[in-house]
Structure formats: structure tokens, C-alpha cells
């Protein structure tokens, strides 16, 4: 999320948008009923993971959120491909490692990529490769940063998920000619094996770990697309859950868009829209200037009965991995424009905690299981 927001804010070239109203966004949660025969989701195909690389301002990412339940290591590996105003294309590899049992393990690297190239679903750069094999396995090799040499193999365990037919939310008063877009495509539960080599040549092994893979596109400036985000990746011995929610600024009617997935080891149990994220015990953060939750709950809502909750993932946000000041690396003159004109003061709060999933399948069977959740609560503007 950090580089995604940073890239767009760095390209800010003017003012806050006028208030177009909620009709100026066509979220995937509404477009579903006009595409894919009204089905909430479909299984992904290899073409869904091809890099789109549009020739206008956008940030496109492929991210693997990994969890090793045996030793508490969690984190993510992310490739970022961004285009600023159709003029400059850059790429970055970011990596996070954190241990929920040992807070001294907290590694973050962000490295600019050189000589990068896109080939369909694959991505190559100097000292880095990411390749999709047989629509089943991703192989990642990166030695671009000696503090985080990564070699992962991720194997999909369930169907992939794309909401609607194309996963797209569009911004603009004319649906046929949108001026912005948002897209997410998922592999919600995968196994991961591999190694992480740190600067002191310590090798951290991941054996039969779990990962959630998401490919995302944000085709407009981030502070215009959303004023806040809630994101959760949960992994336990037998279940995975992901939920992603963004709320638009007033210019698009403060519209909430929420999609979520729950799986077991073999299949998709729930793919739902219009879910609910609940912040509890909020506390004002003097550093970021936001009311930040101390507890959080991600509720999954039945597609046919909006009053029926079919699952939830919840827990305390007691372990703050990092409070990310998105503006920290942005030039001062851009900060002044963004905060003064656009009203943005973006902070990302990253957490890693023990969470609990509760599932009610509607047949009287209820499942409850503890696991580990990685959460991002992002505030961009009021």
C-alpha cells in the first residue's frame, strides 16, 4: 500500500476534485449484477494475471502475503509497476518480514528495479524474476537487495477469485469512458516454500507456509480514488480469509466498496460483497492525527440476505508492525500541495496479531479457529 499511495501523491498536479456524487463511481459491487450473469465471482484464468500496464497514471502490483504458522513469521513480497502521467515508468520490489512471537524480527526493504520487463503474467528485472507456471505455481527469485534475498515457490490450493467478470470499479460520469479505475484479483489460499536470506547471511526457511496472492491496479491518483482503506489477510491451519474495503472521498459520495473471501484447504467457501468492517476502542494517535482502532472485526455478509452474517474474523490490534508516514519520502513542496489543497495526510497502520475466524455455513455447522491476521488500516484524507 505504501508505494501505491506514494507514487500517486508524488504525481499530484492540482486541486481536490469537485463533488461529482455517488453516480460517478461504478463499483464492482454494483457492476457484478451487469456482468458475469449476475454471479458474484468467477474462477480466475491465467489471462487475469497479465500485467495491464495502461499508458496513463496508474500503479499496478503483485503481492504475496506469507504466513508461517509454525514459527510466527509473516510478511509480504511485492512487485510494483507504476506510470506517472504516461511519461515515466518505474518499478520497485518491497519486502516485509515480521514475527508475531519475536518483535525483534522486523525487516523492511524497498528497492528500485532496473532493466525491468513485463511478459504476460511474468515480470523480470535485473536480479529478479517472477514467473507463473501452469496457472498453478508462481516462482519468485529476488537478489536485488542483500538484506532480503528471497526465493519463494507459491502453489495455489483453491480456485482463484475475480469479482464479477473483470474485477473492475470505474470512476467517471460516463460509464463508457471512465477517467479512473480500481481492480483486484486473488489467489486466496496457497502454500509457500522457500528461503529468506538476510544481510548477516542468516537463512530463514519457510516450509509448507501459507500465502495469499493479490494482483491490483489503481488507475488514478490515490487520494482521489479513496479516503481510507481496511485490509486483512488471515491464515489458519484450515482456513484463509481476505477482506478489502475502500471508501471514496466526498467527491464520489463517500461510497464504500467491500469484497471478501473465505476458503478452506480446497475450495472457496464464501465470496461476498458489501461486507462490514468494525473499528472498536478507537484511540487518537498524536503522531498520525487519526482515531485508530485497538480492536477490529471483519464481517462477511450473505449475498442474498444483507442482514445475515455468514462469517467474521476479529481480534485485538495489539501488535503494531509499523506506522507508515506516506509523506516521509515525498518532497516538501509536494507535501504542501497535497495536505493544503487536497486535504490528505496519509498514514498506514500495519498490524500482525492472533485473530479468530467464525464461520456459519447456514446448515447449522459452525466453525471457529484461531490463526494469524495481517491488517492494514489506512487513512488518506477526511
UniProtKB/Swiss-Prot annotation:
PANTHER family attached to this UniProt entry: CERAMIDE-BINDING PROTEIN SVF1-RELATED, SVF1-LIKE PROTEIN YDR222W-RELATED
Keywords: Cytoplasm, Endoplasmic reticulum, Golgi apparatus, Lipid transport, Membrane, Nucleus, Transport
Matches recorded under InterPro entries: Ceramide-binding_SVF1, Svf1-like_C, Svf1-like_N
Membrane topology: Peripheral membrane protein
Compartment(s) of residence: Golgi apparatus, cis-Golgi network membrane; Endoplasmic reticulum membrane; Cytoplasm; Nucleus
UniProt GO molecular function: ceramide binding
GO biological process: ER to Golgi ceramide transport; response to oxidative stress
Keyword Endoplasmic reticulum: yes
Top-level taxon of origin: Eukaryota
Protein name, as recorded: Ceramide-binding protein SVF1
Gene Ontology cellular component annotations, sorted alphabetically: cis-Golgi network membrane; cytoplasm; endoplasmic reticulum membrane; nucleus
Amino acid at each position: 500500500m505504501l508505494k501505491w499511495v506514494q507514487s500517486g501523491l508524488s504525481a499530484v498536479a492540482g486541486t481536490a476534485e469537485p463533488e461529482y456524487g455517488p453516480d460517478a463511481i461504478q463499483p464492482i459491487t454494483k457492476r457484478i449484477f451487469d456482468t458475469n450473469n449476475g454471479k458474484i465471482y468467477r474462477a480466475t484464468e491465467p489471462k487475469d494475471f497479465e500485467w495491464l500496464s495502461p499508458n496513463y497514471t496508474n500503479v499496478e502490483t503483485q503481492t504475496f502475503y506469507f504466513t508461517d504458522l509454525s514459527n510466527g513469521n509473516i510478511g509480504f513480497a511485492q512487485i510494483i509497476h507504476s506510470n506517472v502521467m504516461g511519461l515515466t515508468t518505474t518499478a520497485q520490489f518491497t519486502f516485509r518480514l515480521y514475527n508475531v512471537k519475536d518483535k525483534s524480527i522486523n525487516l523492511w526493504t524497498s528497492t528500485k528495479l532496473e532493466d525491468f520487463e513485463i511478459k504476460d503474467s511474468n515480470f523480470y528485472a535485473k536480479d529478479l524474476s517472477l514467473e507463473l507456471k501452469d496457472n498453478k505455481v508462481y516462482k519468485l527469485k529476488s537478489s536485488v537487495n542483500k538484506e532480503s534475498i528471497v526465493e519463494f515457490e507459491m502453489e495455489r490450493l483453491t480456485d482463484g477469485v475475480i469479482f464479477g467478470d473483470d474485477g473492475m470499479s470505474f470512476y467517471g460520469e460516463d460509464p463508457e469512458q471512465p477517467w479512473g479505475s480500481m481492480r483486484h484479483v486473488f489467489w486466496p489460499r496457497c502454500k509457500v516454500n522457500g528461503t529468506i536470506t538476510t544481510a548477516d547471511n542468516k537463512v530463514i526457511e519457510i516450509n509448507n507456509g501459507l500465502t495469499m496472492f493479490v494482483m491490483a491496479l489503481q488507475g488514478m491518483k490515490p487520494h482521489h480514488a479513496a479516503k481510507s482503506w481496511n485490509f486483512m489477510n488471515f491464515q489458519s491451519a484450515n482456513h484463509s480469509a481476505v477482506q478489502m474495503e475502500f471508501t471514496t472521498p466526498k467527491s464520489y459520495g463517500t461510497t464504500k466498496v467491500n469484497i471478501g473471501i473465505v476458503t478452506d484447504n480446497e475450495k472457496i467457501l464464501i465470496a461476498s460483497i458489501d461486507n462490514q468492517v468494525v473499528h472498536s476502542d478507537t484511540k487518537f494517535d498524536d503522531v498520525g492525527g487519526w482515531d485508530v482502532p485497538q480492536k477490529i472485526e471483519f464481517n462477511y455478509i450473505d449475498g442474498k440476505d444483507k442482514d445475515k452474517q455468514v462469517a467474521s474474523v476479529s481480534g485485538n490490534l495489539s501488535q503494531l508492525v509499523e506506522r507508515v508516514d506516506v509523506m516521509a519520502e515525498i518532497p516538501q513542496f509536494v507535501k504542501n500541495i497535497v495536505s493544503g489543497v487536497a486535504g490528505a495526510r496519509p498514514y498506514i497502520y500495519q498490524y500482525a496479531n492472533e485473530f479468530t475466524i467464525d464461520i456459519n455455513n447456514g446448515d447449522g455447522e459452525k466453525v471457529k479457529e484461531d490463526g494469524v491476521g495481517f491488517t492494514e488500516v489506512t487513512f488518506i484524507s477526511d
